[in-house]
Amino acid sequence: MAPSSNHKVVIVGAGPVGSLAALYAAARGDEVEVYELRGDLRDPSTIPLNFTKSINLALSERGINAMKHTRRDNMIQKILGEAIPVYGRMIHGRNDEKLWEASQAYDVHGRHINAADRCHLNNALLDELEQTPNVKLFFNHKLTGADFRAKKAWFEQRTPADNTSRAPEVEITFDYLVGADGAHSISRYHMMKYARVDYQQQYIDALWCEFHIPPTEEGEFRISPNHLHIWPGKEFMFIALPSADKSFTCTLFASTSYYTLLESSPESLLESFDKNFPGVCPDLITPADLQTQFETNPHLPLISIKCSPYHFGSSAVIVGDAAHAVVPFYGQGLNAGLEDIRVLFECLDQHGVYDLNASPESRALSRQAALQAYTDQRTKDAHAINDLSKDNYIEMRWGVQLPLYKLRKSLEETLDRYMPSLGWQTQYVRVSFSTQPYSEVIKAVERQGTLLLYGSISAIISSAAIVGVLAWNYPMRVSLLSMLQSPIQQLWSVWRNYHC
């Protein structure tokens, strides 16, 4: 453990992001207290905040890199040892009454994301915290108030079995508070009383419902475990991600009106799945189970949040979903939250917050500058992944089947494989297999798109010139013109529609 920093850090939220923040602070010698609204998250009876039992998440480079900075190799090995490597998408469909599937690799170099158990990840982080002497965990504590000028906060000590009497309240002091308490953050609510926060909340026109594909009778996976399975529809989609117990956790994403249609009768649900998600029912989920799961599991909205700034003075900062809830279509919500912690503590380190020779007043000023730097750096990147995640919903439910998507993916992967010095990569690779800032990812992808467009136009002009020369010099072979005209027109139409 590092020498005591004489900082007291209070973290609200003991989920993965809050737990990682506690490990970072503890490693720097801070006195850390973690307060969690729910009971001990390692207790199976603890109810998730979204009231579902969903256990799957996509853990990729950003999240793994952030955890590696804790230098707790055993913890990381424990987490990844239970994860399932996912190398790409498996697109499902049906033509002429025949089922088909097509694999789309994420990366030409064979890299993969990890389908990880959310509970297993959170438990591993909490176990590490419990073994860290300068960390205290407080479950069943609800944040009820905060004074970020006086650096005080108040929590109710809740007793799960007692819902009648008023919970006793405790007052605590801190040097700074980290709000990691999710999209409906109480920390953010209280911080907004002090900081002039621009806040934007959006519910997209989509609901989600969880389904479950069980293992076979022999205890094996029913479909490939190393893919994210997608049944795309133009306005909706059904996906499946593998779990360690050989089952799949599935999600139906669709508009409110589509859910209303499915709710109208049992026949509507079965007919819709047979038409739009071929091979799911009855092959993977029985009709009875499909109906039961649809009626039993909640139909939940998807929330997207942007706000700024992420801090107040030297005493408060929000991270993860509390700062930037994103829709789940890039699998980056948790990864972005974990990356927040790496960026936050890099800013604290760079501004000399942990200089033990500095006075408390000087360190407070340094911390204020560090939190401002964190806001400046992270806001643009969080807004970028927010936008990318929304756009990826369109790609997953529709774009993966378009010729343009396949053409651009093929071109970019070819350049990445055979001319790596150009630094050419697909958007997915930049997001999932690097730590390139999200805002820079958007700029790089736009630049690549522009170059590909100009390259295509040049190819069209060159082809037209060649055809013209041939037609002039070899009139008897003018049929070559009509032979090339159609594909040239198609290529131009695809690029024009894509960029308009």
Curated annotation (Swiss-Prot):
One of its GO terms (cellular component) is mitochondrial outer membrane. It is found in: Mitochondrion outer membrane. Its EC number is 1.14.13.9. It is an enzyme of class 1 (oxidoreductase). The chain crosses the membrane at residues 451-471. This is Kynurenine 3-monooxygenase acdD. Its cofactor is FAD.
